[in-house]
Each structure stands twice: as structure tokens, then as C-alpha cells.
From Swiss-Prot:
Protein purpose: Molecular chaperone. Has ATPase activity.
Lineage: Bacteria, Bacillati, Bacillota, Bacilli, Bacillales
Name used for this protein in its record: Chaperone protein HtpG
Similarity remark: Belongs to the heat shock protein 90 family.
Annotated spans, B: 342-551
Sorted UniProt keywords: ATP-binding, Chaperone, Cytoplasm, Nucleotide-binding, Stress response
Length: 625
């Protein structure tokens, strides 16, 4: 028996790998299974050039056994095995990858690829084991060898007995400590869960004896527990199958199996790309909004596989924030991984995949909107807000990608419509896309400022969500048509000459100046209205900050008291206006009373808080008595 030291020169390097490279101890099983899969792959490639070998896939498998009594976890494979020299080279040298060397020497075809590339995965075993024993026999040798190490004081190699070609790895699982329990890695349910999580799509069967309950042979009314060998992994990933082979039910089953949601997917997108970068993806748009979607706890991201092995559960870089509702997975053979295979190097390949996925999602949504509007409306009610946030965020950088996906309720169509639909119906000579804001469609329809615009035949889009107007401010225009709020102080709408005369008369100017003085800075201006028909009063906003935006900003923490510049508009054709003129001429106190009442009434209509509810109540009583 030979005792040797690791060629990486230091015990500290191994400790660093075990304790720092991997973030989760359960990863060790993924690494060992990947190595076993590589060993079988090498056998396959060898058979392509060696006529004396035949590769019958059914003969090749990976076996996992747990021995709780002796605290051992055993893995066996029927792969190519290792010679003594390969044991020294691959297991005696940290960060020496036999699989990487094999890839460089072998032309990889037929859709196979070798998983391993760093030569450190094997050492992940020392995260859970205080001793590792490897017995292996190479296809090139009649002699088997035993490699053994405690991960601290070098390793030993000695001849061993093994009839078949392949490798057996025995992990002597650590004893529990106050901080860590290692018993779980000997539990059947835990081992199965780790295999399903990381290695479900390894191309060779991963077999394990599992406990099953069956009726007794002599008494079917009584059950007994038996050991039964089962294949734990699925092996054939759905994403590598032809789309023509799959039904909607297959995608739904995959969605449920992966626990992407409790609902059914509303839509799936199956992507297979074989170009500058090769990857497969299955993406899902959920039917309903996840309960935590708009909370800080929600994590976006797609599952990321490298050659069928799960690398990341949520790769956030693959999805833009505005498509964060998308679930699914991506599998690629072309990714540059870091040394632990747990994370990606942020390289060109990842960016290319992310860009392509974004394009696929956008294209699918546009197709749904055009061909299945009812389904799209269902999607939009669940996730439309996120698209609007996407328009608003990053200073509108993504508006061109998203503007055609937006829907708003239409005053004339009585349903959700796209901006493209609105523009196609615009009246001849109409220069603006008109919109109104409020808490609900019903309340918006009753707003004073919508009455005249609607009566003149203009379609109005209803904005009922906080983000709507912020998003539109970033859009600014659509198809060269600017957006205009019906509450805007400079609303572009025709008025008759008589109304213009009322507005510009010297007598009215004095009245409005007096009312503005009474309100003492609460409004920027008082004037007659061009948009009121049956309502007496209305508050318009002058400037970039609208009244709806003021409400949203005021509700935020640290709001810095941002307010819209308000203009009080009076309907010159309403009896109230005549009462104001009479009070101006005869009773200054009454004018003050009327002015404050009208201002507070306008605040209430807009859903803004009264500055002094007690005073408002007292003024109402004065009018009544």
C-alpha cells in the first residue's frame, strides 16, 4: 500500500474547496452522479472506435445504496473505470479533470457531452464524509485498485479485487455535530429528493433500493415492507423531445412535476436553438398571479441546467424584471460555469440566451394578443401591471419592447383595448390620445372632466392602477400621437366664441383673482372651464405632476410633500357661476364661503383628502340654514 500526498501542495487548498466552493452540502451527490455519468459516456465513445466493444445502453446504470447502520453511502457505476495512473492523476491532483482532458481528445457527437470539466467535484464528498474509498477497475486493465483518503492527510492506493469494469465509491458519512446533522444523507427520502432535484435528467438510470409497502403473500389484508429496486430519475428530458411528440397535457404534467405553480400554465413556449449558442428551454406563463408575486419575497428566475444537470434553481439573469412572472427552465451545453458548477460566469453565452428568451416571450405574447385576445386578456389581468412597471422602470428604456402589449379600458368599446386599436379609431384631425384616471371604470365615467370630451366623440382610455400614468409619462407618445389627460389644464378641445368671451371678460377676471386670493396659494389659477357641461366645478392639473400622481406620491413613505399645481375650473353655464358673480358684487363673506366649498367639492371629486374636514362641514351647515 502506497501513501501519497495530494499534488496540489497543500491541505489548505482541499479545505477551501470543501468549505468555500460549494454553498450547499447536498451538491456532493450531484457531483458524484455527474462523474459516474461521464464514466459511462467515455465507455460509449470508446465503443465508437473499438470494434471489440459494443455499447448496449440497457447494461449501463448508476447505483446508490445507503447503509444507515454503518453510516455508509455507496455509489456504483458501470462506466469505463480508472487505472492506477488515472487514479493518481485524477484523484491525487486537485482540480485535475479527466473528463476535460477526454473532451479535448475526443470529437463529441450524437448529442452526447461530457459533464465534468474542473476535477474538483469528487472532493465535494468530503463535505459529508470523513473518509472516502474508491475501488475501480479500468477497461484497459485486469487489475482493480483501491484509493482511500480522509481528505486531510493524503491518500493511499493499493491493489483490490473487482470482477467487473467500473467504479464503486463509498462515503463514510460524518458523525453529527452540534451545528450539523449528517444523518439526512443516509435517509432514503432525502437521497431520492436530491437525485430528482439535480440529476433527474442524467441520461443513464440511477437505481436505488427503496422501501415499498405491499400486501403479504399469505394474507392480502396485511401489508409488509419490502426492498425494491427502482429507477429514480426520469432520464429523458422533455425539452429534448420534438414538439410534435408532445401534447399540452405533457407540458402541464411537467409544470406540475417541477412545482412551478399550483395552477395550470396559461401558455407554454418550447424553444430549441442550435446556432451561435445551443440551448433548449421550456417556458410557462402561469394562469394566475402567485400569492407572493408583488412581495419582496418573490424571486424571479429560470431553472438552469448544464447538459441536463441542474446548476441553478433560479437564474435571475435569464429574465428581465418585466417578464419575471415566467416560469420554466433552460438547458445548454455551451455555458461557462465557475469551478463549483453552482454559478455561471457572466459571459456572452448567458447574455445571448437571455436576449433570445426575452424575444421569444414577447413574440408569444404578441401572437396571443392577436390570435387569442380572450386568453391574452386573462394573462393581462394577472400580469399587466408588471408590464407597466417595465415601461416605467429604467427611465423608459424598455418602452419600445412593451408598448404594444399594453391594454386599457376604453370608454367607447367598453372593454380592454390596445394602443394600436385606439389609434386606428381616432377621429380625423384628432392629435392626442385622451385618458382619464380614477379608482375604477365606474368612477371615471362619472368624472366632470370626461363629459365634454366624450360628448365630442373622443374615445377615452381609463387608467385605474397607480402605475398607469407613470408608465404613460415614460411613453409620452404612441405612433406619433401624444397622450393627453382630460384633467390637463391645457386640454386641447374646441370651445365656442361665447365661452371664450366669458373667460376673457374683465369682470370675470376680477372675480377669479379674488377667488384665487381667498384660496391663498392652494391653486395656481381660477378660470372658466372649456370641458364642463353639467357639473359646476373641477380641479385641473398644470404641469408634469397630475392629481392622480400626487395621490400616489403622497401615499409613499418619505413623499417630500410633492403636489400638483392645481387650477380651479368653473362651469360658466352653471347656476353656481351666477351665484359666484352675485356674491362677488354683494357679499364678500358669502363669496369666501362659496369658494371654499367649491374647492373642497372639487377635491372630493378627485379623491383627494380635505385639508380641513371640520371647516368643510361647518360651511355646509351655513349654506343650509
Amino acid at each position: 500500500m502506497e501513501k501519497k500526498q495530494f499534488q496540489a501542495e497543500s491541505k489548505r487548498l482541499l479545505e477551501m474547496m470543501v468549505n468555500s466552493i460549494y454553498s450547499q452540502k447536498e451538491i456532493f451527490l450531484r457531483e458524484l452522479i455527474s462523474n459516474a455519468s461521464d464514466a459511462i459516456d467515455k465507455m460509449y465513445y470508446r465503443s465508437l472506435t473499438d470494434d471489440s466493444l459494443s455499447f448496449e445502453k440497457d447494461r449501463y446504470a448508476i447505483y446508490v445504496e445507503a447503509d444507515k447502520d454503518n453510516r455508509k453511502l455507496v455509489m456504483k457505476d458501470t462506466g469505463i473505470g480508472m487505472t492506477k495512473e488515472e487514479l493518481e492523476a485524477n484523484l491525487g491532483t486537485i482540480a485535475k479533470s479527466g473528463s476535460l482532458a477526454f473532451k479535448k481528445e475526443t470529437e463529441i457527437e450524437d448529442g452526447h457531452d461530457i459533464i465534468g470539466q474542473f476535477g474538483v467535484g469528487f472532493y465535494a464528498a468530503f463535505m459529508v464524509a470523513d473518509k472516502v474509498t474508491v475501488i475501480t477497475r479500468s477497461i484497459d486493465s485486469d487489475q482493480a485498485y483501491k484509493w482511500e483518503s480522509d481528505g486531510t492527510d493524503g491518500y493511499t492506493i493499493e491493489p483490490a479485487e473487482k470482477e467487473d469494469v467500473g467504479t464503486v465509491i463509498t462515503l463514510h458519512i460524518k458523525e453529527n455535530t452540534d451545528d450539523e446533522s449528517y444523518d439526512e444523507y443516509l435517509e432514503e427520502y432525502r437521497i431520492k429528493a436530491i437525485i430528482k432535484k439535480y440529476s433527474d435528467f442524467i441520461r443513464y438510470p440511477i437505481k436505488m433500493n427503496v422501501t415499498v409497502s405491499k400486501p403479504k403473500e399469505d394474507n392480502e389484508d396485511e401489508y409488509a415492507e419490502y426492498q425494491e429496486e427502482q429507477t429514480i430519475n426520469s432520464m429523458v428530458p422533455i425539452w429534448r423531445k420534438n414538439k410534435s411528440e408532445l401534447k399540452d397535457s405533457d407540458y402541464e404534467q411537467f409544470y406540475q412535476d417541477k412545482r412551478y405553480g399550483f395552477d395550470k400554465p396559461l401558455e407554454h413556449i418550447h424553444v430549441s436553438v442550435d446556432g451561435a449558442i445551443r440551448y433548449n428551454a421550456i417556458l410557462f406563463i402561469p394562469e394566475h398571479t402567485p400569492f407572493d408575486y408583488y412581495s419582496k419575497e418573490y424571486e424571479k428566475g429560470l431553472e438552469l441546467y448544464a447538459n441536463g444537470v441542474l446548476i441553478m434553481e433560479k437564474c435571475a439573469e435569464l429574465l428581465p424584471d418585466y417578464f419575471s412572472f415566467v416560469k420554466g427552465m433552460v438547458d445548454s451545453e455551451d455555458l461557462s460555469l465557475n469551478i463549483s458548477r453552482e454559478m455561471l460566469q457572466h459571459d456572452r453565452q448567458l447574455k445571448l440566451i437571455a436576449k433570445n428568451i426575452k424575444s421569444k416571450i414577447k413574440s408569444q405574447l404578441k401572437t396571443m394578443l392577436k390570435k387569442e385576445p380572450d386568453k391574452y386578456e386573462k394573462f393581462y389581468k394577472a400580469f399587466g401591471r408588471q408590464l407597466k412597471f417595465g415601461v416605467y422602470n429604467d427611465f423608459g428604456a424598455n418602452k419600445d419592447d412593451l408598448q404594444d402589449l399594453l391594454l386599457f379600458y376604453s370608454s367607447t368599446e367598453k372593454k380592454l383595448v390596445s394602443l394600436s386599436d385606439y389609434v386606428s379609431r381616432m377621429k380625423e384631425g384628432q392629435t392626442y390620445i385622451y385618458y382619464a384616471t380614477g379608482e375604477s371604470n365606474e368612477r371615471i365615467a362619472k368624472l366632470p372632466q370626461t363629459e365634454m370630451v366624450a360628448d365630442q366623440g373622443y374615445e377615452i382610455l381609463y387608467f385605474t392602477e397607480d402605475v398607469d400614468e407613470f408608465a404613460i409619462k415614460m411613453l409620452r407618445s404612441y405612433d406619433e400621437k401624444e397622450f393627453m389627460s382630460v384633467s390637463s389644464a391645457d386640454l386641447d378641445i374646441e370651445t365656442d366664441e361665447k365661452q371664450e368671451e366669458e373667460t376673457n371678460s374683465e369682470e370675470n377676471k376680477k372675480l377669479f383673482e379674488k377667488m384665487k386670493s381667498i384660496l391663498d396659494g392652494k391653486v395656481k389659477d381660477v378660470r372658466t372651464s372649456k370641458r364642463l357641461k353639467s357639473h359646476p366645478v373641477f380641479l385641473a392639473a398644470d404641469g408634469e405632476i397630475t392629481l392622480e400622481m400626487e395621490k400616489v406620491l403622497q401615499a409613499m413613505p418619505d413623499n417630500q410633500n410633492v403636489k400638483a399645481e392645481k387650477v380651479l375650473e368653473i362651469n360658466p353655464n352653471h347656476d353656481v357661476f351666477h351665484s359666484l358673480k352675485q356674491a362677488y358684487e354683494e357679499d364678500e363673506d358669502k363669496l369666501k364661503l362659496y369658494t371654499n366649498l367649491l374647492y373642497n367639492q372639487a377635491l372630493l371629486i378627485e379623491g383627494l383628502p380635505l385639508e380641513d374636514p371640520v371647516e368643510f362641514s361647518q360651511n355646509m351647515c351655513k349654506v343650509m340654514v
